């Protein structure tokens, strides 16, 4: 038997969320000798910000000014960790319980030289609340590494259950954009990839070399290439290119580290959808685009005793003219 999502009542979800409330969200701040910095909430092991050495005043990540910060509801912006479900699943919080759980800070060490990263590691594991929704045993580890102009994150799912499990996993990057209109941001690297358009509810193949935005976009690209780029035109900042490199793998006893396929989600709610979101400003769609690596087109299977790793590197550089 493979244990996938078990649909329970929403009352269990409410009980989980109600137990997590906090007056103020605790964070850990990473700093690097080159001048970069990043901040991560314990709640959701949620990366809040990433300021690169090339421009310490610039946040690579978008954070909504309307976001909930109550330690109960999910945070809108940064890098939410989506697990074990992508989107809606009966009896589960939207995008899973990982992003609305207080994780444990396992370790934190800032770099003492420019060659090495500053690192924070977080953990969470199955609890009575998660078992009520999903009756399996697991442990999650999330590692955040800060370099001068790179942020590396890795989500590790350890199957400590006696049987195989299945899940979705996604790193929901919100990138800061000066102005998403008029080709102010262009995403590339997905031409020829099959995708599901969640707005039109149709399957299609990407024909564009460059994806620009003029309306609501919510595409799930299956088995996407491992390198994606977002070229962002500066308004009060330099023109810049954000590169996302992603990878998935399974390791453990009897496994030498098998590479797995990963997907990519590209999302912008645009004007009408933005107005319908309580935790998102009406005009904030102009200042973000989400480019999200993960495994969500199908559920990721993980044998007992094995570990699944989803990792990404977000790097930033001035756009070459």
Predicted regions and their residues:
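Beta-strand/loop-rich accessory regions of lumenal/periplasmic or secreted enzymes
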Residues: 73-98, 186-203, 296
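Signature of Gram-negative chaperone-usher
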Residues: 101, 105-107, 118-122, 244-292, ...
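Intrinsically disordered, low-complexity Pro/Gly/Ser/Thr-rich segments with frequent PxxP/GP/PP motifs
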Residues: 296-309
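Active-site/ligand-binding surface loops and adjacent short beta/alpha elements
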Residues: 164-166, 174-263
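Beta-strand-rich N-terminal accessory domains
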Residues: 20-78, 232-259, 306-321
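Extended, loop-rich substrate-binding clefts of extracytoplasmic carbohydrate-active enzymes
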Residues: 93-148
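Acidic, contiguous internal or C-terminal segments within carbohydrate-active enzymes
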Residues: 126-167, 171, 178
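Fungal secretory targeting signals
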Residues: 1-19, 23
């Amino acid at each position: 038997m493979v244990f996938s999502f078990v649909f329970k009542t929403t009352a269990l979800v409410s009980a989980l969320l109600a137990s997590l409330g906090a007056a103020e969200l605790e964070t850990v701040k990473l700093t690097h000798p080159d001048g970069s910095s990043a901040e991560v909430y314990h709640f959701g092991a949620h990366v809040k910000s990433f300021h690169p050495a090339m421009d310490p005043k610039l946040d690579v990540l978008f954070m909504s000014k309307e976001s909930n910060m109550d330690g109960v509801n999910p945070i809108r912006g940064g890098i939410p960790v989506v697990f074990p479900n992508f989107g809606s699943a009966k009896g589960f919080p939207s995008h899973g319980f990982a992003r609305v759980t207080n994780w444990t800070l396992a370790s934190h060490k800032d770099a003492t030289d420019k060659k090495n990263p500053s690192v924070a590691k977080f953990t969470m594991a199955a609890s009575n609340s998660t078992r009520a929704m999903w009756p399996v045993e697991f442990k999650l580890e999330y590692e955040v590494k800060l370099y001068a102009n790179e942020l590396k994150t890795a989500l590790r799912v350890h199957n400590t259950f006696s049987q195989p499990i299945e899940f979705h996993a996604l790193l929901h990057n919100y990138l800061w954009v000066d102005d998403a209109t008029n080709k102010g941001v262009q995403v590339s690297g997905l031409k020829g990839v099959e995708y599901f358009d969640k707005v039109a509810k149709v399957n299609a193949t990407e024909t564009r070399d460059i994806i620009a935005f003029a309306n609501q976009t919510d595409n799930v690209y299956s088995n996407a290439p491992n390198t994606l780029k977002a070229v962002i035109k500066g308004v009060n900042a330099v023109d810049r290119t954000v590169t996302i490199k992603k990878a998935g793998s399974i390791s453990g006893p009897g496994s030498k580290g098998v590479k797995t396929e990963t997907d990519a989600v590209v999302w912008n709610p645009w004007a009408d959808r933005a107005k319908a979101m309580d935790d998102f400003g009406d005009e904030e769609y102009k200042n973000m685009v989400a480019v999200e690596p993960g495994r969500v087109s199908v559920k990721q299977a993980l044998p007992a005793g094995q570990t699944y790793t989803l990792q990404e590197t977000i790097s930033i550089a001035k756009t070459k003219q």
